[in-house]
């Protein structure tokens, strides 16, 4: 048994990297599900649903929104494309509800994002200051979903509320994990400073701030990322709430591989145009670097210890490697248990290691994509 200076250095490296890796985990911070302070009373609300041609999702989810048990006045506005007769038929079939209204996006809009035009038309049609914007395929978990979300909307201190979203149980595990992993960084920035972005297709904000800020001015040419640009432009320091309650839960159907990859590339392009993202990117890159560096050095130390018969160094390095894996998995388990997200726990260490490779492939796909896919400026 050899315990020399080199062994002490190897042991120190293994221990320090274990501590650094565990510190640099987005799952380390315990999520606060409960509303801070007294829950806000339900405010009059305008819910804007954007169809984007997804009539099947509208048919499935619109009745769930119309049947919401909401104590205050609720206006539901469905924004459809002009000439979308299937969506119009669905709205006519459900038009008996006094909550339901509709507007349309004209076909003549060519020089700006139709998605952002749809948002703008919906907000202008809203009669209440609090607006909840969502895609038509957002499925509420319960009849109290809107009530649960709006309890976080304190009028004096909150100007927007982010609602993290998850895929349904049929989704691939890595899709679910990647969405949660990215969302934790967005949630962290929102709770500890100023919100940077979101990967959910749902957001609560104030109509008067949207109108005073001239809507999407500055990003009208970007075809995608309406939720991310809204969060980035209108977030104020320490004024973004997060609705993590079980009853506030929203889910989306499982995307196809092609759809998921396109969403990832579009999100990457959108984030290139967002402001105040320095700290977000620094923390994200530090966490990824610490994860890989810890595993690499711990494995290298244990192998070197075995080859040179420094058994203590090898044993400590292996112990630190196992400790790193086990603690990270336990933190992931705590998070997915808190949020009640279906996921195979045994696969999560492999999902974590896959993140950087996935990001690299997304970057490559973005580089190979025609940039006119992201902007309405075709010059």
Regions found by a protein language model. Name each.
Residues 95-96, 104-114, 118, 122, ...:
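Long helical/loop segments within the catalytic core of UDP-sugar-dependent glycosyltransferases
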Residues 128-139:
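Short beta-strand-to-loop acidic/aromatic patch adjacent to the donor-nucleotide binding site
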Residues 4, 289-371:
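Membrane-embedded multi-pass helical conduit in multi-pass membrane proteins
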Residues 158-182, 211, 217-282:
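Catalytic donor/gating beta->alpha subdomain of glycosyltransferases that bind UDP-sugars
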Residues 63-109:
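Acidic donor-binding segment of Leloir-type glycosyltransferases
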């Amino acid at each position: 048994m050899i315990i020399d200076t080199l062994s002490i250095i190897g042991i120190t490296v293994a221990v320090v990297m274990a501590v650094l890796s565990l510190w640099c985990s987005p799952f380390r911070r315990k999520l606060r599900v409960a509303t801070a302070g007294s829950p806000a009373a339900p405010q009059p609300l305008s819910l804007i649903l954007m169809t984007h041609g997804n009539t099947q999702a509208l048919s499935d989810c619109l009745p769930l929104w119309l049947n919401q048990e909401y104590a205050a006045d609720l206006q539901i506005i469905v924004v459809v494309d002009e000439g979308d007769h299937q969506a119009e038929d669905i709205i006519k079939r459900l038009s008996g509800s006094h909550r339901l209204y509709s507007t349309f996006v004209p076909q003549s809009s060519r020089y700006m994002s139709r998605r952002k035009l749809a948002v703008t038309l919906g907000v202008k049609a809203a009669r209440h200051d609090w607006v909840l914007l969502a895609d038509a395929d957002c499925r509420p978990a319960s009849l109290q979903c809107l009530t649960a979300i709006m309890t976080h909307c304190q009028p004096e201190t909150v100007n927007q509320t982010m609602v993290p979203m998850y895929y349904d149980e049929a989704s691939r595990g890595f899709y679910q994990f990647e969405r949660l992993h990215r969302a934790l960084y967005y949630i962290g920035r929102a709770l500890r400073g100023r919100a940077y972005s979101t990967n959910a297709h749902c957001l609560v904000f104030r109509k008067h701030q949207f109108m005073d800020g001239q809507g999407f001015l500055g990003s009208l040419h970007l075809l995608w990322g309406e939720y991310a640009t809204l969060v980035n432009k209108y977030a104020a320091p320490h004024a973004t709430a997060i609705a993590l309650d079980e009853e506030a839960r929203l889910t989306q159907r499982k995307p196809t591989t092609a759809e998921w990859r396109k969403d990832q590339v579009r999100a990457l392009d959108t984030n290139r145009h967002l402001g105040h993202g320095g700290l977000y990117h620094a923390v994200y890159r530090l966490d990824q670097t610490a994860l890989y560096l810890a595993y690499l050095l711990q494995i290298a130390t244990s192998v070197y210890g075995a080859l040179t018969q420094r058994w203590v160094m090898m044993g400590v390095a292996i112990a630190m490697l196992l400790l790193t894996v086990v603690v990270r998995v336990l933190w992931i388990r705590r998070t997915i248990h808190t949020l009640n997200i279906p996921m195979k726990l045994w696969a999560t260490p492999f999902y974590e290691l896959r993140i950087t490779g996935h990001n690299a492939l997304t970057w490559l796909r973005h580089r190979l994509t025609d940039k006119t896919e992201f902007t309405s400026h075709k010059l």
